[in-house]
Regions:
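Conserved acetyl-CoA-binding loop-helix of GNAT-fold acetyltransferases
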Residues: 158-161, 173, 178-181, 187-204, ...
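Active-site rim helix/loop that mediates acceptor-substrate recognition in acyltransferases
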Residues: 97-136, 165
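Acyl-donor-binding surface of acyltransferase catalytic domains
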Residues: 35, 41-66, 238-241
Length: 245
């Protein structure tokens, strides 16, 4: 998540109108020379899920209506369309046209498949399809980060090439890199169903936790994380004492 896909915006207006503008936490707002100037300022938080906890089945989309399937790089084109629709009103992609969002989606997904977000774990990445329509309605992609203190900013990127056998050895730290849902199928537990599907192979490989990242201002993502049992990772600079778990 970065400002790569967030355009700087300049809109001429009266200062009184500027004061009444709604704010988005992903942008910095300034009034300069008779115009509102919005500059990208995305900030992210990290959260962690204890994989020993069971995800309640009642929170998950019905297995009668939706089918989980493996996710493959050959699904990239369909995934890009789904991605673009899912993030239509969400930063850092909300300021793009539909064509630009599809392009951004394709680039982001290829980065993940190619390991730029850490080694991609195909065995823990899934699709969800509507049984009645056969339509793709959700996807989750998991990668592996360095095994480190999640409060340390360096824990979220590989400074050196990661070993190729991390997954086979149950090493590295799983990270929920992308999860997205069709706009017409939100609110029925699709994301939670995908999360439950991902948790199973992670547990089987001996992983105890799953990290995730969300952008400040994406309230629906934040609430989804809390509803599914994620806990906020404290900042390494925080002076608050850490809770012992």
């Amino acid at each position: 998540m970065c400002d790569e896909w967030m355009p700087k915006v300049r809109v001429p207006m009266a200062s009184e109108s500027f004061q009444r503008l709604p704010r988005n936490a992903a942008y910095n707002y300034e009034y300069l020379e008779g115009a509102a100037v919005l500059s990208p300022r995305p900030r992210t938080y990290h959260a962690i899920l204890d994989l020993t906890r069971t995800i309640p089945s009642e929170l998950q989309a019905s297995a009668v209506d939706y089918e989980v399937a493996p996710l493959m790089p050959t699904d990239a084109e369909a995934l890009a369309q789904l991605f673009a629709g899912a993030f239509e009103r969400t930063q850092p992609f909300a300021g793009l046209t539909i064509e630009e969002r599809i392009e951004a989606a394709a680039v982001c997904l290829q980065r993940t498949f190619q390991g730029h977000d850490g080694p991609w774990v195909a065995e823990a990445s899934f699709l969800l399809r509507s049984r009645s329509e056969g339509k793709l309605v959700g996807a989750i992609l998991v990668t592996l980060l360095p095994q480190s203190d999640p409060a340390d900013i360096s824990a979220y990127e590989w400074l050196d090439a990661p070993p190729s056998d991390l997954w086979m050895k149950g090493q590295g730290q799983p990270h929920l890199t992308w999860i997205f849902t069709h706009a017409w199928h939100k609110g029925v537990g699709i994301g939670t169903r995908l999360l439950a599907a991902t948790a199973t192979p992670l547990r089987e490989h001996g992983y105890a936790s799953l990290l995730s990242t969300f952008i400040v201002g994406n309230d629906s993502s934040q609430l989804w994380h809390w509803r599914n049992g994620f806990e906020l990772v404290p900042s390494i600079t925080s002076k608050r004492p850490r809770l012992k778990t």
